Amino acid sequence: MIDKMTQLVEDSLEEAKELAIAHRNYQLDIPHLWAVLVKPDQFAFQFYQSLEINTNQLIEIINKEIDKIPVLSSTEKSSYARLYSQRLKNLLDDAHQEMIDLKDQVLTVEHLILALFNQQRNPITVFLLEQGLNKEKLYQKMHRIRKGKPAISSSQETIYDALEKYAVNLNQRALDEPVNKIIGRQDEMNDIIRILSRKNKNNAVLVGHSGVGKTAIIEGFVQRLVKNQVPKNLQGKVIYSLDIGALLAGTKYRGEFEERFKALLNDIIDSNGQIILFIDEIHSIVSAGRTEGSVDAASILKPLLARGKIRIIGSTTHAEYRESIEYDRALERRFQRILVHEPDLDYTMEILKGLKPIYENFHGVRLEEDGLEAAASLSKRYISDRFLPDKALDLIDEACAAKRLASHAYPVQMTNLSQQLISEKIRLLRLTDSDTDDKFKLNNHLEQLEEQKSQLLANWQRERELLDQVQELRSHLTALEEQANLALENNQVADYVRLEDEEIRKCHQKMTALEKERLDSQKIINVTVTREDIAAVVERLTGIKVQGVMENERDRLLHLEELLHQKIVGQDQAVQKVSQAIIRSRAGIQNPKRPIGSFLFLGPTGVGKTALAKRLAEVLFGSELEMVRLDMSEYMEKHAVSRLVGPPPGYVGYEEGGQLTEAVRQRLYSIVLLDEIEKAHPDVFNTLLQVLDEGRLTDSKGRTIDFKNTILIMTSNIGSTNILQSLQDSGCITSEVRYKVLDELNHSFRPEFLNRIDETVLFNALSEKDMTGVVKVMVSDLQARLLEQDIHLTLTESVYILLAKEGFDAAFGARPMQRTIMQKLENPLALYLIQNQKNKEKETFVTVSVKDKKLKFTFS
C-alpha cells in the first residue's frame, strides 16, 4: 500500500467506505470515491470546474455507476465494503506511480485524477475524454497551480491558490461593487502612503477604538489606488484583505493553519511587491495557530517583515494592540503605528452629510438636517460605550428603518375607519325589523364610511406609488452623478457636460414634479426623518428621555411637587429641591457633565428619606422597583468596597462586574439610592467623588460607566439627635440646631465629598399634625389592596386622628404607625375575611368609626 498520502485522500477513502456501507455494497469502488471527491466544496470539484468540465453531468454518471454496483441482502454491516475492488486497487497503484514520476513526497487527489485516465473503459474516464480532458491538460493545470513545486505537505490541496482562497481582492471589489463614499481621513491615508513608500519598516497598523473608521480608511485608500491617485511607486499595486475565517476553517490537524498561511504569504512574495496584504483585526491572526509545541502566525510573519519580503497593513484597537502586538517587541518594531482618533462633532457632521444620500436611497426616506445634527449630538451625549461616527450612523439607520416600516403600514385613519365600520355593522345586525328609521340612518352612515375608506385607500396607494417613483429616480440620479464624477476624473469633459446638462437635469425635473404632485394631494405618508425620530431611537436604546416634553408629561412635571406630596408628608423643602432638579433636567439646562442631581438627606429615622426616593421612582418610571438601591451597611468593611465597581482581575466575581456600575450600566436613566451612607467604609466616598463631580465611574474592567442621567440620593441619620431635641424644645429646627447638624456632618465626611453634593437637605421630624397625613397615606395603600378583593374600606376623620395620636412617636417617626395600623385595622379585617370565606364573591363595604375612644367596624 501507499506509504504516505494527503489528509484529504485519507478522509475521502474513509468517507467513500461509509458511502459504500450506506448503499450495502460488498466492495469499495471508484464511483464511491469519486462521489466524495466531486462534492461542491471539495478540491476535485473545483479542479474539474476550472477545466470547464460539466460537473452536474459528471455527478449524474457517478451516481448511475454506484446504482449499478451489486447490493448485498445481508443486514450485517460488517459484511459491507470489506474489500477494495480490483479497479480501485489498480487506480491507487497507478496514482502511486504518478507520485513517483512527479518526484512528489505524498499522494494527492491530483495523482488519483491522473491515474483514472489509465482506465480508458471506465464510464467516468469516457465522459471526461468526451469533455476534451486528457493527461496533457492535467499536467499543465498541475504545473500552473503548483508553480513548479513538488507536493510535500499532508494538506497539499488546501495550499493551492491560497491567495484567492483565503483573501479578497479589494481593488477588484472596488471596481465591481458600489462602495460608500469616504469623507475626510486624508491625513491617515497619506500616512499609509508614506509608510508603504519607505524602504524599511514599510508596514502600517491602524490603531483606534471600534467604530471610528479604520476599515473605511482602507476602503478610501483602495479607491485612490484604483483611480491612480497615489504616487507612481504605488500605482498598480493590489490590496488583498485576509479572510481569517476561511484561513482557519477546517484546520483540524496541527500544522495545517501554518501551511495555509505560509502558502498565502509565498503567493504575495511571488508577486514581487505588487500585492499588499490588509489584515483587519490583526491581533486575531498574531496568536492564531498558537498551541503547545507549534509556531504562531507572528513567528511566520516576523522574518518576512524583517527582510522586507511583504508589505502589510493591519488594524486593531488600543487594548488589543497593547496585548498582542506591543507585547511582542520584535513584531512591534516591524510596524509603524497610525493612531485613528474619534472624530469631533463637526467632523462627524461632515461624514453624515456625505453619507446622507446613501441612506436616503436605501430606505426611501428624507433625512432632515436637524436629524443629522441630533444623531451626532445625542449619540455623543447618551451612548458613552461606543464611538463616533459609527454610533451616529447606527441611530440614522435605525430611525430610517423605523420610518420606512411605518410608511408601508396602513394609515391610522384607515384602521380607525375599519373599526368604526365593524362597530356600525354590529349595531345594524342587532336592530329589529321595527327599527326602520334607525336602520335607514345606519345604512346611510355605513355607505359614507365605506366611501371615505375607499377614497383614503386610493389616496394612500397613489401616494405610495409616487414615493416609489421618487425613490427610483433618486437611485438613478445617484448613479448618474457617479458616472459624471467618473467622467470628470477621466478627463472626459464632453460626457460630463452631457450628463450634467441633460440627464441629471431631467432627473431633477421629474423628481420635482412628482414631489409637487404629492404635496398638492392629501399628504398621508410621512417619510421625513427628523430630530424627534432620532430622539425616539435613543430613548428606545438607552431608556433615557431625550424627546421633547409631551403634553401629558408637561402636566406631570408642572405638578411634580403635588404628586410627591401625595405620599410624602411634612417635607416641603426636600420635595421642592428634588422637583427643581428634575425640571432642570427635562428642560435641558442642567450641567451635562454632572448627574441630574445629587442629594444628601439628613434627619431622624422614619421621616420619609427613603420614601421620597421611592415615590420619585414611582412618579418618573411608574414603579418604585425601577430604582438602584444599595444598603451601605453592607459596605462597612474595606474589602467590600470593591463590590461597587467589581473585584480586580483574578478574583472571584470579576466577570460579574460591580453592583453599582452594572446596575447603572443597565439603567442609564435611573435613581440611585445609597441608604444610610454614614455606615459605609470611608473608601466608598473616594469612589463616589468621580461620580459626583464628573458623572462617570470606571469599573474593574476599565469600562467608563455614565452617571450623567442619574439622580443620586444618599440618606443618613447624622444629626438626628440634635433635630429631635430641637423639636422637643421649640417645635422646629432652629438655625443653631442646623449649625450643629452641619458641624457633625463635617466631622463625619471629608470636605471634598460634601462640596460635590448639590443639596444637603434636613428632613423635619414629624409632628402629631403631620402624622394624620401619614395615616391617610398608609390607609390609602391598604384600601387599594382591599379593593382588589372587592372590599371597600371607609374611615371617618376621627379614626385618622385617633390612629395618629396612638401611633405617634417623635423619636421613631412614621415606622411605629405601621405597627399601629397593622394591629388596629389589618388584624380585625383579616379575622373577618377568614370567617367569611363563603361570601368572598360578594362586594363588602366596611366602615370604621370611633366609639368610646375605640375603633368600631361596621360590615355590610
UniProtKB/Swiss-Prot annotation:
Residues 5-69 are annotated as: Repeat 1. Residues 393-522 form a coiled coil. Residues 766-860 are annotated as: C-terminal. The keyword Chaperone applies. It is found in: Cytoplasm. Residues 553-765 are annotated as: NBD2. Residues 2-148 form the Clp R domain. One of its GO terms (molecular function) is ATP binding. Keywords: ATP-binding, Chaperone, Coiled coil, Cytoplasm, Nucleotide-binding, Repeat, Stress response. It holds the Pfam family AAA_2. ATP 1 binds at G208, H209, S210, G211, V212, G213, K214, T215. GO terms for cellular component: cytoplasm. GO terms for biological process: cellular response to heat. Residues 84-148 are annotated as: Repeat 2. ATP 2 binds at G603, P604, T605, G606, V607, G608, K609, T610. The keyword Cytoplasm applies. Belongs to the ClpA/ClpB family. Part of a stress-induced multi-chaperone system, it is involved in the recovery of the cell from heat-induced damage, in cooperation with DnaK, DnaJ and GrpE. Acts before DnaK, in the processing of protein aggregates. Protein binding stimulates the ATPase activity; ATP hydrolysis unfolds the denatured protein aggregates, which probably helps expose new hydrophobic binding sites on the surface of ClpB-bound aggregates, contributing to the solubilization and refolding of denatured protein aggregates by DnaK. Homohexamer. The oligomerization is ATP-dependent. This is Chaperone protein ClpB.
